[in-house]
Amino acid sequence: MAEHPPLLDTSSIISSEIPLLTSPIVSGDGAQQVILVQVNPGEAFTIRREDGQFQCITGPAQVPMMSPNGSVPTIYVPPGYAPQVIEDNGVRRVVVVPQAPEFHPGGHAVIHRPPHPPLPGFLPLPAMIPPPPRHIYSPVTGAGDMATQYIPQYHTSQMYGDLDTLPAHGRANFRDERSSKTYERLQKKLKDRHGTQKDKLNSPPSSPQKCPSPTSEPNGLTKGQDTAGISTGSTKSKSVGKGKSNSQTDVEIEEKDEETKALEALLSNIAKPVVSDVQARTALLMWSPPSIDVGEDTDKTNIPGVYTYEVMISNTGKDGKYKTVYIGEENKVTVNDLRPATDYHAKVQVECNCVKGSPSEVESFTTMSCEPDAPNLPRITNRTKNSLTLQWKASCDNGSKIHSYLLEWDEGKGNGEFCQCYYGQQKQYRITKLSPAMGYTFRLAAKNDMGMSGFSEEVLYHTSGTAATTPASPLLINAGVTWLSLQWTKPSGTPSDEGISYILEMEDENSGYGFKPKYDGDDLTYTVKNLRRSTKYKFRVIAYNSEGKSSPSETVDYTTCPDKPGAPSKPSVKGKIHAQSFKIIWDPPKDNGGAAINTYVVEISEGSNGNKWDTIYSGAAREHLCDRLNPGCSYRLRVYCIGEGGQSMASDSLLVQTPAVVPGPCQPPRLQGRPRAREIQLRWGPPQVDGGSPITCYGLEMFQTETDEHREVYQGSDVECTVGSLLPGRMYNFRLRAANKAGFGPYSEKCEITTAPGPPDQCKPPQVTCRSAACAQVSWEVPVSNGADVTEYRLEWGGMEGCMQISYCGPGLNCEMKGLLPATIYYCRVQAVNVAGAGPFSEVVACMTPASVPAVVTCLRGLSEDEVESPHYYPSTCLALSWEKPCDHGSEITGYSIDFGDKQPITVGKVLSYFIDGLQPDTTYRIRIQALNSLGAGPFSHTIKLKTKPLPPDPPRLECVAYSSQTLKLKWGEGTAKALTDSIQYHLQMEDKNGRFVSLYRGPCHTYKVQRLSESTSYKFCIQACNEAGEGPLSQEYVFTTPKSVPAALKAPRIERINDHTCEITWEVLQPMKGDPVIYCLQVMVGKDSEFKQIYKGPDWSFRYTGLQLNCEYRFRACAIRQCQETSGHQDLIGPYSSPVLFISQRTEPPTSTNKDTVQTTRTQWSQSDQVCAAVILALFAIFSILIAVIIQYFVIK
């Protein structure tokens, strides 16, 4: 069906012979839901109305039904048809199909309930019901089927039982082949699911929901909703099984997804809408259903028959914001409420079975122009007795410019008949020759090329008339302390459009000046300010217009309100302040605000900085007794008063301190920890009653039971105390009292505490006897044991007084210390221990061991050549040593003995470095050293191996292997691979202009190229070899001379044709080179010759060559020759030849031949230019290579 659901018309009441489909009842509280029942064309749908009668609705139609209690509505089916409820991928479908003979052989067909809530229940159908949400209906998939839009789609996990058996009615034959195929397909689905539904009763639908309903809509399932069902059959509760049922469900899901994709592709294949009948405010949009290619094998029953279309338009461009103007099944719609002369863009989107396709292409159209909108009513700008001036604004022209306005009036008759007053382009008009105090009604219309607009609202204006009448007396709106707000009304009988002004006059009786104006204006209200409080004022009002003033209104009296009173005086104390009470008094405020004071309120706050105020008194008296206070507390009090004008500010606060009393008794002190032998640690808490003052002191008293001698052992503010100087194992009594600024309170009850046995007393200092430099004997005496025998002694020994360690622990009275260092101070002390603990250590005793030979020399090492500053040091025959000074063990070190092999050891003085000379080059020595003092020689140090370096090498022979005018390549030594890996370095030097030799190269290479030299110049060089032994001697001086430079290469010569047998060759001119003249040599190669022949040699830079043969190739090249004048004779230096130039001689002919020569000449010029470019690139590359070589030579090698 592709139409909107029509209104439900009343139809004939069906007979009771039509079978009725009864549905199971659902228990629990069901949510209110909407069911959209679709009736196909040619079919009928029957419902029961509220009055109990039956109504038959013929298709095509859509019937919305509501269910408040979750029950399935009553649905009638025609004879010969039976309804079936099936579950298809999580969606319930109610299908009405013809009955088959084999379907009801004699029993009832049992249809299992799918795992979903049942169909919503039935409610009386109203005359008008809003359409359901778009996502709850979709097109019908076949004849006689109820599509899925009948059933709201939502998830659920509740369990339901089987449906009751349904009675079979109707005919036994099928109506047509299409119905038979539909029935067979649905029956197969029903039988396939019959075995799997029982196992899926407790599981949600396995199919993904394409269009889930939100819980806020009528057909959604709210959270926590009870959807349990009751069935007349047996209720089964099983978990979802595995195996065949699940695999079959997965296959169905995949099939459903493929069907959804195919449907979505079909819905997206829709053409853009067609726009017709475009008017100023309406347009007709039409479109076609999605196109589909139906083949011979295509199942036509799978093609959707009903689509839902959504039409969207936009007036902000194709990519602007679209709004939906239509949703339904029609193929056309008339869009209303459009704006004239506006561009619109429209597109359509198709939906089927809750699946939407892509929107169509955009169709653009423009609405027509039309008459203007009705203008606003004209307003008055000036008014006199005989004229009115009106003005108005232009309205929307709707696409056509407004060219005139029509102003009509009723001529003051008031009968509703209007005639033309003005017609033109102006936007204002002055109407003259009017009557005074007369009302005239006007209306306005605008006109453009499309027609006349509607008239504006009618407006009534009056001309000026007589003077204003007397207004009523002003009324009081509100009153304040210094202001009065008044209001008055317009005089009766005054036209509504007449401009009237008012004068408000006030009289202050105390001033004696009478009435004075306070306001002059058009407003009907005014607030008179700057008045005095509690004062009576008289007011009257006068109205006036352009014709004159009215008489004053009747005089009225109004009084300002009283002000809030001032703050009372600061309260003061009356009489003596007691520990728990005192009396206060206060004076009334100096300013009562213009009215009598009714009440005084006293507030109190505990503490000097408290912010919490409590009311303790409210009355008319001016004194109050504050009682039930705490001793020793600070209180702040303040007073404020209340009058007719309000509440005053609070007075300044009074600070009162109640006197304190002595504190109450404390609890007895208690023992903190375990009792010790000579001291007890006691702890206590403050008393429960502090007397109103902080506890400042505690007093602790002690006495023994035997002597009953009292003694105060502690007085202070702490809550704990350690009582010392006690005897071990004795009983002591203690009692406590607390004190504040008022004095001490009573003592607490006494407590008895017994001391524990104590550790031994402090031992006497031990005695130390040194037996040798590495051994000492320590002994001590037995101390006082304090009631327990000493079980062991602990001896601490160390080289520092504050860092000693226990070296002996045992019952003995002596100990021997071994492994000591000579001439070293040691510290020791001893401690006694018994069962009660360890006693205090004795005083520390210091002793010093006797002196001995020095310790082992450490850090013996060899020095490098750079670390030795002596000029007599030669690494080939000398070895330098250094070491650190060892411990002298109490006797100053007098020297060191160095042992370096079979030779006699060397004795040196008190030095820490020394070099041994007279050694053999390139020889290894084993060296060790020992320190000497007055007591003898110490032990030798560790042995090190040092080797003397070989002798420096001799300088090599220097040779020049290559040269040029600016470079010399020098070579020395053997340049083999073995020599390159040797440790020998070479230092090449050259003499500069000042006669000094400067370094050119230092490194292991055997060749070096000297660059940037001058031509024909002699240079002096020398070289020396270096190795790890040092630098060898310099070689003799070598002199090498650079030759003169040859001229540079010339550019390609230029050839100019003279005639058929003659041409002129021109080449580049070079300047003389350092005084030497330069001549030129020109060569030619004719035809297929392989060698160039000289045709000219001389100083000229051009040559005319004759004897050219026609159609023959000639190649010319030139070079420069430097003529050097040497002492030995004349010498020519020939430079490189230029690149050859090709020239072809041809006969002079008409313009065609000339063109050929031109082409050949152009080709020759191009060849010359290419050669020049190649030469420039080559020169730049050479310069760049030289620059890189210089940088490497300067920064890397040096």
From Swiss-Prot:
Highest taxon, organism lineage: Eukaryota
Locations listed in the record: Golgi apparatus membrane
Name the residues that span the membrane.
Answer: 1172-1192
Q: Name one GO cellular component term.
A: Golgi membrane
Q: Which parts of the sequence are annotated with region: Disordered?
A: 189-256, 553-574
Name the SUPFAM superfamilies on file. Fibronectin type III
Biased composition of type Low complexity is found at: 229-247
Q: What keywords appear on the UniProt entry?
A: Golgi apparatus, Membrane, Repeat, Transmembrane, Transmembrane helix
Fibronectin type-III domain: from which residue to which, for each copy? 269-370, 374-466, 470-563, 567-661, 665-758, 762-852, 864-951, 952-1045, 1046-1151
Membrane topology listed for this record: Single-pass membrane protein
Enumerate the SMART domains for this protein. FN3 (SM00060)
Biased composition regions of type Basic and acidic residues, renumbered to the chain = 189-201
Gene3D superfamilies per record: Immunoglobulins
What's the main place this protein lives? Golgi
What Pfam families does this protein's entry cite?
fn3 (PF00041)
Indicate whether Zinc appears among the record's keywords.
no
Q: Which family does it belong to?
A: Belongs to the FNDC3 family.
Q: Which PANTHER family match?
A: E3 UBIQUITIN-PROTEIN LIGASE TRIM36-RELATED, FIBRONECTIN TYPE III DOMAIN CONTAINING 3C2-RELATED
Question: What is this protein's record name?
Answer: Fibronectin type-III domain-containing protein 3a
